[in-house]
Amino acid sequence: MSRIAIFFPGIGYTMDRPLLHFSRRLAAEMDYEIKPITYGGFPQQVRGDRGKMEECFRLALRQSVEFLRDVDLTAYDDILFIGKSVGTIVAACLASQSAARERIRLVLYTPLEDTFTFRLSEAIAFTGGNDLWVGGKESRIAALCAARNIPCTVIPDANHSLETNDVQKDIETLREVMERTRQFIVRRIDKAIE
């Protein structure tokens, strides 16, 4: 069974940050070919500025399309798109347009509302209960997930990095998020073995 995991980072949340670093390690342990995308050229002070956010999406989308130009997704049996923040929008957009869309599963770390403007087939989401990028305590992410039957874990008091001011709590949160991510990934592998 051929497997690939493509990573779509956030604006400032790169592959060396905990959520993406450990999810990459999980996927590698399960024999996924790893393809991390890197972006560049984003504007500064994006949060709260719709125009700058759209510019970030366009830049990330263009760079992702270029990065994936020579990757034939239809050659893979199992495809993971793992995104963080703006990367979740790019991942959802590309998944919805892909000829292999029925084989693409998405892991959405702190998705933004625009992520849900695209058709998502199989996904899991994680959001912070105090994520100011999506309205903090007024966030609609959990409701958007529920409307699409996407399991969503809300981490109380966590910010856009799924962190709080309590280091021990953050370590436990990371452990919980990685375990749920692992279970999501393993489900497809287990089905293929049956």
What are these regions (language model features)?
Residues 20-21, 121, 134-144:
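Short alpha-helix in the alpha/beta-hydrolase fold that links the catalytic acid
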